[in-house]
């Protein structure tokens, strides 16, 4: 795209256009209509505060409680993932019977 000629450089052929000034331009951002006002934000619902002493079982926590109850019966492995000596002996005897 050709560059605009400044009035200083147009002394040659179009000398009569030197006196004409170009209109000033406004940026598109300024000439655009102002944005509509933002609507009021809706108030958020506040959750009902519960007593700190009340316990509620949720998801995985409820499952952990079930596992602890089963552990008390002696059927589940201990907390560290180690098997009890009785269970280890039972599994070894089952393995030996298959051979």
Curated annotation (Swiss-Prot):
Q: Which UniProt keywords apply?
A: Chromatin regulator, DNA-binding, Nucleus, Phosphoprotein
Q: List-wise, which residues carry Phosphoserine?
A: 6, 78, 93
Mention one GO molecular function.
Answer: nucleosomal DNA binding
Q: In which tissues is it expressed?
A: Expressed in kidney, lung, pancreas, testis, skeletal muscle, heart, thyroid gland, pituitary gland, prostate and uterus. Low expression in liver, spleen, placenta and ovaries.
Q: Name one GO cellular component term.
A: nucleus
Residues modified as Phosphothreonine are 10
Q: Which domain of life is it from?
A: Eukaryota
Q: Where is the signal peptide?
A: none
> Which one Pfam family would you cite for this protein?
HMG14_17
Q: Which GO terms describe its biological process?
A: chromatin organization
Which stretches does the entry tag as region Disordered? 1-99
Its subunit composition reads: Interacts with the ligand binding domain of the thyroid receptor (TR) (in vitro). Requires the presence of thyroid hormone for its interaction. Interacts with transcriptional regulator SEHBP. Interacts with nucleosomes.
Q: Which family does it belong to?
A: Belongs to the HMGN family.
What is the recorded function of this protein according to its Swiss-Prot or TrEMBL entry?
Binds to nucleosomes, regulating chromatin structure and consequently, chromatin-dependent processes such as transcription, DNA replication and DNA repair. Affects both insulin and glucagon levels and modulates the expression of pancreatic genes involved in insulin secretion. Regulates the expression of the glucose transporter SLC2A2 by binding specifically to its promoter region and recruiting PDX1 and additional transcription factors.
Q: Can you say what this protein is called? A: High mobility group nucleosome-binding domain-containing protein 3
Q: Origin organism of this chain? A: Homo sapiens
The root-end lineage is: Eukaryota, Metazoa, Chordata, Craniata, Vertebrata
């Amino acid at each position: 795209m050709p560059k605009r000629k400044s009035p200083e450089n147009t002394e040659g052929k179009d000398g009569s256009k030197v006196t004409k000034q170009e209109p000033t331009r406004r940026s598109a951002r300024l000439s655009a209509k102002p944005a509509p006002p933002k609507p009021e934000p809706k108030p958020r619902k506040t959750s009902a505060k519960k007593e700190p002493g009340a316990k509620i079982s949720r998801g995985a926590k409820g499952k952990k409680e079930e596992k602890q109850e089963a552990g008390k019966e002696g059927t589940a492995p201990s907390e560290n993932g180690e098997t009890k000596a009785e269970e280890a002996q039972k599994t070894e005897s089952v393995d030996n019977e298959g051979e």
